Amino acid sequence: MTNPKADLLAHLESMAARYQDRWTLSACGVTVGRRSIPALLDKNSNSPGANTASALLISGLSGSADDVALARRALDSTPSDDAGPGNHISLSAIPDCNPDGLRDLSTGYPPIGGFFYNAEEPEKRYLWRWICFLAPTLILELRSGEAVSWQSNEAGSNLASALARSGGRVENESLLDSLGSGSPDGLGPIPGLRLTSPPESLDDELGKLWKLLSEQPGLREASPARQVLEARSARSHLEVAHILASVYGYQLDPVNYTQGVGISGRLQLYELSKTGESPASGIVDLVEPYVSGSTPMFGERVGGANLAGLIWGRELSAATGDPRYSDLIVAVANRYQPGVDGGAPPPCDPDFRTEDMFMAGAMLGRAFGITGETRYLDLLVGFITGGNIQQESGLFWHCRPANFYWSRGNGFAAMGLTETLTYLPENYPGRDTVAAMYRKLMDGLVKIQDPSGMLSQVLDMPGSYQELTATCMLGYSIARGLRRGWLGPSYQAPLDLAWRGVSQRVDDEGNVVDGCASTGVQATLNEYLDRPAVFGFDDRTGGMALWFALEMHRHQG
């Protein structure tokens, strides 16, 4: 055999092509050398209510080529009815967790901070998060050695006992050890076994494990981590919305869309559910200093993100009967002026950034809805169709000088097109062009949606982290499109997948998983890959998740 690490990707591609009904080729991370970490993913691994247990095979943490060769041997035997796990177990694999092999990644878990920009060991962060949210029934680590040995983590001790081959516990702070106790990433533990074996003993040892799992259904129960994820998925759209609305939308300093979307979401939720106390009076108190002028609403430099901080104006007027709040939207829309020589309308960035597609779409569209004046739509349609940053794939560059497929940048484009279509009359000039751009983008994003339902931080970089805000924005845009008849029923499955991924990444306290931090235009691909991912409270992500939940309720109830 050639170096088992060198041609691994081609080997996995071949296996995925040969067994298309079983596997898909994916990626679970990016190395410090900017190589994707390939993963062979069983197509049932993310399926709700699957009748099979899920096992994840991992190897190569130390960088050892012998370990990777052992994992390849295990995978090659899997399709065989005699040696494979059979129909009761879906098997996914990360055969080489450490493709660069620059450092030994065997210990040092859980990784603390630096998601996913750690300069020395980003692989640990990627592996940790990806495995936690795959949440298999069992993790099986393979290591090459001269003698057979089985070890387990705390959660896998019952499996080790049933095998009657226990060699004790794996070492502290190893990946298996840290995943096997407590509440990794706010979920639950995942049982883990480590098999150390010479190649000639591998098939027999694996056969014992597969036979045991086949004969004892109790050992195939969902891991505690998976149980937490499924419980999150089982919540209704309004349940998730109420959780998010209990946390987000209580600040307006600074005046920015990251605050405004949450405030808007709280008002929308009350109108949809009519449960509890209306948030209107509290929001009136929150915004009054700005509305009255006692507190300056904006600083010296005012961009679209600041103007969209007032996105709640029409909803608050509807809730209170006070027209001042709708008037705020009209006032900020009047700040948009025609561009010069085909340029973007100030205060939009002259480079046609996708952020402005959402900000302008939201505020100019609402201004038209309030006043009926088509001059707002003229500005909006000219801007949306004049940027020329949508590519043949349907995806958008971040802006004209930044030819990078940033995930939230495409989310902003999706939201901008969606908001624009929401307000454009059916016969309005340019509507067909906007609708075609919208459908082309939806097609492009759905094609690259991860099996988890998520979009990656950099859309054309397999293994970049699964980013929550962009996935919420995609889901919102699809749900609105299905509800309004802009999209056909084939989009329901990608929408359901997006909701599943998002709902699993919002806990019962409204904490979120991996929302990209505030990001301006970056100069290099690496800078987009290295944008920090927020885990916990994040008003930007929480507000978008709230809007997504509300649109899902409107669409599906």
Feature-to-residue mapping (PLM):
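Carbohydrate-binding/catalytic loop surfaces
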Residues: 243-247, 264-267, 307-319, 346-359, ...
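Inter-helical turn/loop segments and adjacent helix faces that build the functional surface
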Residues: 367-375, 420-432, 481-489
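Oxyanion-binding "anion nests"
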Residues: 202, 418-460
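Short beta-strand-to-loop junctions in surface cap/lid or active-site-entrance loops
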Residues: 38-51
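CBM-like carbohydrate-recognition segments
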Residues: 176-179, 228-240, 249-260, 272-278, ...
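Short glycine- and acidic-rich boundary segments immediately preceding or forming the N-terminal edge
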Residues: 1-38
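Active-site/substrate-binding loop(s) of hydrolase catalytic cores
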Residues: 31-32, 49-174, 180-187
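Extended ligand-binding groove/face enriched in aromatic
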Residues: 292-401, 405
